[in-house]
């Protein structure tokens, strides 16, 4: 047993002494940096000692194996400890092997080898071995072997040598090609950017450059250089070629020295942005550029497992973006885009063919992969539908931005049949013609033919802008195209485009013409008509198209767009009316105009009359000073008349009467609120106001009129009759007021509340028993 334990202790001592010696050598070499040390000789010494210690550790492992067998027979209680020491030896062997691998790679990185691929391999391998050694360090540390200090020196040495190797590789690369590193952000003037490629003299130099490129690719340096190539080629040279519109005199390729080829942007002024783009010349200029670039780079290739050429590496980073640039910035701009997508199809295909020729040439030069296609996986039908939708939206945007200088009258005229049974008759009529037309009921409503039902779904006569007529025609053609489309995806795109252009109209028009609508009420009325005309046409479009998918396509348009259009129309008109009310409020907010009126003042026919309605009577020939209340009310009526004059022609009968009725209602309601909130009236003021208000009611009855028929009781009945009852109260006795009230059953009770009547009586008549009795009886 003593012999076994002595053998174990002897092995343990040898391992610790060996590790201590190696650790000191590593510290002297990498940590203390002793000048007297011969680096290469010391490195060889450390490597030899690591090998010797590895042999000792392996021998120890074998001896411990024999010791385990002997201990199992002689002393079973020591078996667990011996097995633990055997495992420690195995861990140490693995750690020493990893350290030896690290030192071996450091020797390669430190050597002056001309094979740059060995550098790249050593950098990657050394990093992996260092990671493995770090993972094993904790295990041997638990067994009493501390190697953390020498391992830190290994890591520091790797960092220095790796930096030196990377720097040397970068220097070799820069001697072969000088490409500036530019920001990806497109800022500043890049017309002075250039890059150079230097010719490689001998076969040996070419081999060394290829090894350099391979090593840089292995350690991750090449992708950064490829990004620099990508920015210079695409963002500088290709963009300049596209911006020139014809590719003429965009760049210069020269040889400042016999072994240098330089590419630089021509400083001469190029074409303007609005110049027509020539696809053939632009792509020809690009082809010449890449051909010359290929001529100076064709011999550069990688010597790793990929075997790629340097041109293919550049092509891999520019291929997708360059193809997108050709499609988007060259072909798409040159090809005409129309709403029908039929006119541009032939020319677009021709331009695509020119682009495909360029792609094939790039494949020959090695910049594009063999799988590269100009259109990727897209088919031409999808492209044409997308372009058509883009054209529809562009045309709609142009129509929305047009001013309302050209106006058109739409809707049925005044001679249209008006019959309460029109709907039932039209339904019977439709059933009759359904037998003749079959499923083509759209002919009954076609805008291109005389309608069979001029009053069914009739749109009242009004004025809209010509741009709106064109907008509706564009929308109608779009919807019909969606119905006629057989492809489900294309049909959905066209239907969505129809919905989108209506939303664009709703959102953009109030913003684009906001100043116009706020300053000219007539234009606000035109916009109101435009919105309702579009809504009407959207509803009738369902009769102009037929098919099983009719409901699916039209339902979103009907449910969403019609509501949006009517809402924005109402908002615009309400803003106009709000401004009008605000201006009238400025005249009526001074309550002093209702007080201290001239004694026995009487209005005449010319009071509140329009200028064209005034007669040459005595009060015109001899002008008199009118009280302030007359001037303020006349100003309000003048404002309403001006609005009415501007809106009578464009608006429909109903809308016109509602708009003017709203303004008149506001005026009358303002007067009513003033009277019912006044606590005391002078007798003369009450009599004059009764006369003034009576004359005012006569005038507004003529203002809220259409076709010489007053509509005041239809559109502002509440305010009109309330003021009429107040006129009665102001100009009559208490007994007459009681009779008109008639126990809350008379005409006065229909329009005025008891509290309002009581308040008027208290303000008009002095406090007396008779007044108290009357109030009690109300």
UniProtKB/Swiss-Prot annotation:
GO terms for cellular component: cytoplasm; kinetochore; nucleus; RZZ complex; spindle. Disruption phenotype: RNAi-mediated knockdown largely results in sterility. RNAi-mediated knockdown also results in a high incidence of embryonic lethality in the embryos produced and defects in mitosis which include the formation of chromatin bridges in between sister chromatids during anaphase. In addition, there is reduced localization of the spindly-like protein spdl-1 to kinetochores, but not to microtubules. It comes from Caenorhabditis elegans. It is found in: Chromosome, Centromere, Kinetochore; Cytoplasm, Cytoskeleton, Spindle. Keywords: Cell cycle, Cell division, Centromere, Chromosome, Chromosome partition, Coiled coil, Cytoplasm, Cytoskeleton, Kinetochore, Mitosis. GO terms for biological process: cell division; chromosome segregation; endoplasmic reticulum to Golgi vesicle-mediated transport; mitotic spindle assembly checkpoint signaling; protein localization to kinetochore; regulation of attachment of spindle microtubules to kinetochore. Gene3D superfamilies: 1.10.357.150. This is Centromere/kinetochore protein zw10 homolog. Component of the RZZ complex composed of rod-1, czw-1 and zwl-1. Residues 47-99 form a coiled coil. Essential component of the mitotic checkpoint, which prevents cells from prematurely exiting mitosis. Required for the assembly of the dynein-dynactin and mdf-1-mdf-2 complexes onto kinetochores. Its function related to the spindle assembly machinery and kinetochore-microtubule attachments likely depends on its association in the mitotic RZZ complex. The RZZ complex recruits the spindly-like protein spdl-1 to kinetochores. To prevent irregular chromosome segregation, the complex also inhibits the attachment of the kinetochore-associated NDC80 complex to microtubules. InterPro entries: Zw10/DSL1_C_sf (IPR046362), ZW10_C (IPR048343), ZW10_C_2 (IPR055148), Zw10_middle (IPR048344), Zw10_N (IPR009361). Belongs to the ZW10 family.
